[in-house]
Amino acid sequence: MTGEVLLGSAIAIIVMAGCYNTTMFLLSRRRTRRVRGPRRKRLYVFLLACLNEEKVLAESLARITALPAGNFLALVIDDASDDGTADIARAADPERVRLLQRTLPNARRGKGAALNAGIRHLRESGLMDGYDPHDVIVCVVDADGRLDEHVVQSVDPFFDNPSVGATQVGVRMYNRHQGLLARLQDMEFVIYGDIFQCARRYIGSVGMGGNGQFMRLAALDSLAVPGQEAGPWSDSLTEDLDLGVRLIARGWTNQHCTAAAVSQQAVLDVRRLVRQRSRWFQGHLQSAGLVPLILRSVPTRAAVDLLYHLSSPVLILLTSLLPLSFLVAVAGTAIGSVQAGRPLITPMWIIGPYVLSFTAAYAYGFVYRRRERGLGLLRSILLSHVFIFYGYIWFAAGWWGLWRMLTGKQTWLKTART
């Protein structure tokens, strides 16, 4: 009986997720009409929060300073690094790159704290004096982020609409050719962007990522809490998710740009990848505190999607019981077969789980092939079948993240660069 209950519950969750994914896929195929206002000359400010990033920072700064955009600057926020991060920033183009060095004990308190310090520094330094906050666009870029050359030209038209507070670009893995694990991470971000983020443009619930998020300074200012100087970013382990939800609650529109992307380094070690995802998972658990704000301030359609998104940690933990419940059911059926003297296992034991688990793989393969023409449709679909198993990484990360939260561990688990 217990095995049947577990199996039935897991199947119900998978069916619900399948219906949701199908809806998002269909919505993502729709075209959204862009509302435009008068073109404005804007200042673009790129923020890079860095903690021991000497291995990757130089290439990222070189790409930013080479952008064919007229009015921009980059601020490297050195969060008390022990390596040559600050030296790399100093060696970059002094006309375009500025350095803020934070020191202990105020440093190393999370990415959100570092970004808030960066915004305060920009204000105090006078670099944004004379600019209307509506015409200053702040972009958060990871130290390993490599922005497409045309990213500013692709993003800028979104901000012609005065109601747009933020725009997220796509995310790719620049080392996706270095093995299967890197390729699957690239597929993961393409699927998330081209299906779920695109669908959320129609729903009104586009989320922000920690890399390649462009935000209007006026929108960030609207998140300020009277009497506090902390800044727009929270201390959540997923400060990007938190910020995106609060922007929507403030009445701003978040957009997703499919015409440009930021490429980052894929994690090539399974243990490091699970460690990274455990931090993201823990941050999602922390975001449960946003539920009252969503219920109170977000329009119904967007609120339903955001609540489903925030419930994903619980769904992941419950779904992780499916392999166990399936084994229990198989064992029970095998015992029953012995007792009955005939096999009770039918072809549906194979067909049913395949349909439940792998139907989405065909949509994922179709979408990924549009980004990676060199793979071909058949290879993309085969890869998407492997991608389904890759998703099991979230099961390990989920239980690890839950354990860290229950034991009170809130430190920033930084992903090591290679």
Language-model segment annotations:
Residues P38, H309-T407:
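Membrane-embedded multi-pass helical conduit in multi-pass membrane proteins
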Residues L241-V262:
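Catalytic donor-sugar/metal-binding loop of nucleotide-sugar-dependent glycosyltransferases
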